[in-house]
Amino acid sequence: MREKWLIGYDLSDNYAQISFLSDKAAEPETLSVLPGAEKYHIPLCLRKRKGFNQWFYGMDALKHKEEGEMVTDLFRLAKKGEPVVIEETGYDPIALLTLYVKRSLSGLSVIGDTDHVEAFMFSCESLDERTVEVLKQVAAGLSLKTKSFFYQSYAESFYQYMVHQPEDIWVRQVLLCDYHSDVMKIYRMECNRRTTPMVVYIEKAERNFFACGDYPEEEEKKQNVFTQMDEKMLAMAQELAEGQMITSVYLIGEGFSEEWMKESLRFLCRNRRVFQGNNLYSKGACYALRERLYPTEISGRYVFLGEDKLKANIGMKVYRQGESSYLALLDAGVSWYDARFQTEVYLEEGNSFDIVLTPLNGKDARYGKVTLTGLPERKTPTRLYIEISMTGENKVRLYVEDLGFGELSPSGYQKWTENFEI
């Protein structure tokens, strides 16, 4: 039996990173741009060879400086949607991003034939409607046999990575410091172990920091900058830790590649475990895929409520075999871009029904009335097709179609769409 592979693809504004997980392995591995080295970042750029339809990507694009014009910011350009002009020709920015992703996947020759990729997960900093739309178009253009493409935020990749680590590492809070460019992004993960299932929250914050890599050439001046960085990091770490129970800290990003942490590292290591690395998001994406396709007890024990998660249960009061019952339409904890449910119900009388929203924050359930204006009066029940989905983090779309009641009451072919916010 050939191995099946799960691919976790970390797509940031400046680089990509690829991890892969075999159905025969316990942990993911990460593709290195240099064999034998732990260099995982693939620069997010393309370069077109002047006068030819030949494209270089990643490290090769950086090396071939004299070959032609280079395009950076591929992800931002794709989301912006405006044509990219190269040699007086306009190129679709989503097509360029798709080309980059396809070329970067050529490195997966280490796993053999990509026909055996079972599922693919994109992970990026955040997911709004435009980002999901772009990623879906990229996925459609990759020519992979699998049709199982998924999307998740860095916060959820962090969560998935952590819940697959020994529990003593995250029994209390966990801090993730992601240092790129001149910004320190901080994720704080905490689990409420008093609920069933246990609810995991992640708070996100940003701090301006020193521009990483932009250091003086003179060693003494460079060390002075490092000292200032260390002092600022120490002050920030003390502030983040004040009054908090932090079990472990993860330091990721190019900003931590230089050895400038001295006093700040000593402080973080007091009664805490500190880890450094650069492939957490792509590995977290692999773990998420495995949990989605082959659920373990983790799925039953924990629910993650991130920014892009539905934070309320949505359902209807219905009758089953003469008894009052609850019909779940959407469950809290699902990502808004994955939230979709369809069903058929019978409306016994009238032209309206109620939707029930039950928040997970302990607030009272609230009811919303859906009125089907123009629905004909019938002596028989009306069969309704109902489809519910989400168009944003707090935006719900409800589609209803009149199916009538067989020959006794033919359908009026009426359709209704309602949009509401949670």
Task: Please name every model-derived segment.
Residues 1-82, 140, 150-152, 372, ...:
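Early-domain small/polar-rich strand-loop-helix modules and first-structured segments
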Residues 1-6, 144-175, 280-305, 378:
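Conserved phosphate-binding catalytic cores of ATP/NTP-utilizing and phosphoryl-transfer enzymes
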Residues 2, 8-15, 168-185, 189-192, ...:
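A short acidic Gly-Thr/Ser loop motif
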Residues 16, 41-49, 191-232, 288, ...:
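Glycine-rich phosphate-binding loop plus the immediately following alpha-helix
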Residues 32-123, 206-234:
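Conserved phosphate-binding loops in N-terminal lobes of ATP-dependent enzymes
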Residues 95-163, 278:
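Active-site neighborhood for divalent-cation/phosphate handling
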Residues 121-131, 238-265, 273, 277:
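Glycine-rich phosphate-binding loops at beta-strand->alpha-helix junctions
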Residues 287-373, 383:
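Acidic, glycine/GT-rich loop-and beta-edge segments that sit at the periphery of enzyme/chaperone cores
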